[in-house]
Amino acid sequence: MGSCWSCLDRDSVPHNHPTKFKVTNVDDEGVELGSGVMELTQSELVLHLHQREAVRWPYLCLRRYGYDSNLFSFESGRRCQTGQGIFAFKCSRAEDIFNLLQDLMQCNSINVTEEPVIITRSSHPPELDLPRGPPQPAGYTVSGFSNGFPGCPGEGPRFSSAPRRPSTSSLRHPSPGEESTHTLIASEEQSHTYVNTPTGDEDGRSRHCLQPLPEGRVPLPAQTQGSDQRDPQVLLQPGQVKFVLGPTPARRQVMKCQSLCPGMQDPPHHNNNEGPSECPAQPKCTYENVSGGLQQGAGWRLSPEERGWSGLAHRRAALLHYENLPPLPPVWESQGQQPGGEAGDDGDSRDGLTPSSNGFPDGEEDETPLQKPTSTRASARSHSGFPVPLTRRRGSPRVFNFDFRRQGPEPPRQLNYIQVELKGWGTARPKGPQNPSVSGAPGPTPHPVRSSDSYAVIDLKKTAAMSDLQRALPRDDGAVRKTRHNSTDLPL
């Protein structure tokens, strides 16, 4: 990745400049390679060098960054001017660089999406409280994300974060002695994937993403996660760490609908739409699969004006809410109850197939507490004409029913022919359905045959004579002027 040499007019930069900082580039062993001036503009990091062109790293291409007591380091992506690599700079104002970079990230609405991470460490303590802000003591550094989230402090051996070539096989090197270093590359057991994407979301959402993570504690067995958990969490368990994000916009709408309709929290376990769980304040709406972390027995409904907004929120926040998985394709199963049947014959009236959203039948009330959504109940009515064998009814096991009933082959269609009345062939034939027994006409005969009621007689001699006469006519290409001497018109 090369070295960073002296910067032009380094001494002219004041110590407390708001956007320019005096930095010194260091290598893997902590050896100083050169000095320069790091400037933070509105869109990129700029390193001014002496008698050389400035090196620029756009904020959109920064994968991660962090700081220690006197060391600021970051990891650049492949689209940067320097290519992929990790750069470390000594600076007495490393914390100021970090804070300013976070503010610029927020102004540019740059978010870093982190995939679900499971960190397995054999030496991980069972209980640990994470600090709310960036840690102050030296010895380790918080690996910060571009949206302001501080990462977990590095444990075990410290790793240096000085600049290295992208082609280096291992980006982990031991720290030189007592030198305080910044860890940007985690251990092999830890798998982080960050995607730095610019978004044009509203300011409220950006502020939500830029809030620091709350304190992470080990969840006790007696504690239960409530459905109104609104802040992201870091759950520390023996041997692993789980990152739990906050509720998505669609999830917030569901909780809002739940607060407006308290009766929806205890839905009846049957397939009838007419029940006390129907929300009186809002009309009946379509089913939205946003019950990832909520109780499974609630069939949530959204208002009609929020349907399009919820679908848009699903597409915009597809990388942020992992509990909002897409619904499974419908699987045909035995219908639990006829729409118009009586309440007492719920087990004997199963003569239809209905798609299941969860993959299991919605049979007896005391076995399956899940309530089918509105779209599923509508599909049940449309497929109520398919018979189900007796073995699939009340005593059948609670498994998938892949017994697809298809209709039999269609009856053969009968084609009706109408006899065309020909002139000069005797009396007319009666019109009506005729048996298409004759498939083709007989071949032409060289001599006249007896006239038939259904076929015409072709005069072959006359046809051949007319054909020869047509071939004998000179072809007129339009280049010869016609007169009375060379006219091609035949005499009448």
Swiss-Prot record:
Gene Ontology annotations for the cellular component aspect, listed alphabetically: membrane
Annotated Polar residues bias: 371-382
Superkingdom of source: Eukaryota
Locations listed in the record: Membrane
Electron transport among keywords: no
GO MF annotation terms: fibroblast growth factor receptor binding; identical protein binding
UniProt xrefs under InterPro entries: Docking_Protein_DOK, FRS2_PTB, IRS_PTB, PH-like_dom_sf
Bilayer topology annotation: Lipid-anchor
Domain IRS-type PTB positions: 13-115
Renumbered residue ranges of the record's region Disordered: 122-230, 328-414, 426-454, 469-492
Pfam families: IRS (PF02174)
Gene Ontology BP terms: fibroblast growth factor receptor signaling pathway
UniProtKB keywords: Lipoprotein, Membrane, Myristate, Phosphoprotein
Lipid-substituted positions (N-myristoyl glycine): G2
Post-translational modification: Phosphorylated on tyrosine residues upon stimulation by BFGF or NGFB. Phosphorylated by ULK2 in vitro.
Lipoprotein listed as a keyword: yes
Function: Adapter protein that links FGF and NGF receptors to downstream signaling pathways. Involved in the activation of MAP kinases. Down-regulates ERK2 signaling by interfering with the phosphorylation and nuclear translocation of ERK2.
PANTHER family linked: DOCKING PROTEIN RELATED, FIBROBLAST GROWTH FACTOR RECEPTOR SUBSTRATE 3
Subunit-level organization: Binds NGFR, GRB2, PTPN11 and ERK2. Binds FGFR1 and NTRK1.
Protein's name in the database: Fibroblast growth factor receptor substrate 3
Organism in which the protein naturally occurs: Mus musculus
Taxonomy of the source species: Eukaryota, Metazoa, Chordata, Craniata, Vertebrata
Gene that specifies this protein: Frs3
